[in-house]
UniProtKB/Swiss-Prot annotation:
Residues 1-11 form a transit peptide. The keyword Mitochondrion applies. Keywords: Mitochondrion, Transit peptide. It is found in: Mitochondrion. This is Uncharacterized protein C15orf62 homolog, mitochondrial. GO terms for cellular component: mitochondrion. Pfam families: BORG_CEP. Residues 29-48 are annotated as: Disordered. It comes from the Eukaryota. The lineage of its organism: Eukaryota, Metazoa, Chordata, Craniata, Vertebrata.
């Protein structure tokens, strides 16, 4: 039971560490930064106030977001927009159409698809002439009484189909 209370959110010391530790940590960060700057080769001595002042406000007007800062996004300036490239401009290369030197160099080394189709069709025709032909399915006998089908078409489609059948088979009177 004791271990449960130690790591629980209900423990009062947990909230004290969160709320009361922030200002102290800020000062500790400033002292660590000042020690790191002297250890890194910059031989100037900085006090905690100077380091915090450098972190809060910089000469170019931008500010670094700090723990105690309420609106860190409002103080940061937006980065500059990149330049726009237009297709017609000379700064934008045309990547959709390859240059003439590229097409001339590669068209000479690679065969085209049209040049490959000739031998492909010749081989397939020779191979087909050697193989036996499969028997075709016989055409259905229209006078067979078991051959029947029904198609449900609308009136307009049915009239069009009958008109086409009359044009194709003018000698058949039963359409």
């Amino acid at each position: 039971m004791e271990t449960w209370r130690k790591g629980s959110f209900r423990n009062a010391s947990f909230f004290k560490r969160i709320t009361l530790g922030r200002p102290r940590r800020l000062h500790r960060q400033g002292s660590i930064l000042s020690q790191a700057s002297t250890a890194g080769g910059d031989h100037e001595e900085y006090s905690n106030r100077e380091v915090i002042r450098e972190l809060q406000g910089r000469p170019d007007g931008r500010r670094l977001p700090l723990w105690g800062d309420e609106h860190p996004r409002a103080t940061l300036l937006a980065p500059p927009k990149p330049p726009r490239l237009y297709r017609e401009s000379s700064s934008c290369p045309n990547i959709l159409e390859p240059p003439a030197s590229y097409t001339a160099g590669y068209s000479a080394t690679l065969p085209s698809a049209i040049s490959l189709t000739g031998p492909l069709h010749q081989c397939s025709e020779e191979a087909l002439s050697d193989t036996p032909h499969f028997p075709r399915t016989p055409t259905p006998d229209l006078s067979d009484p078991f051959l029947s089908f029904k198609v449900d078409l609308g009136l307009s489609l049915l009239e069009e189909v009958l008109q086409i059948l009359k044009e194709q088979f003018p000698s058949e009177p039963h359409f």
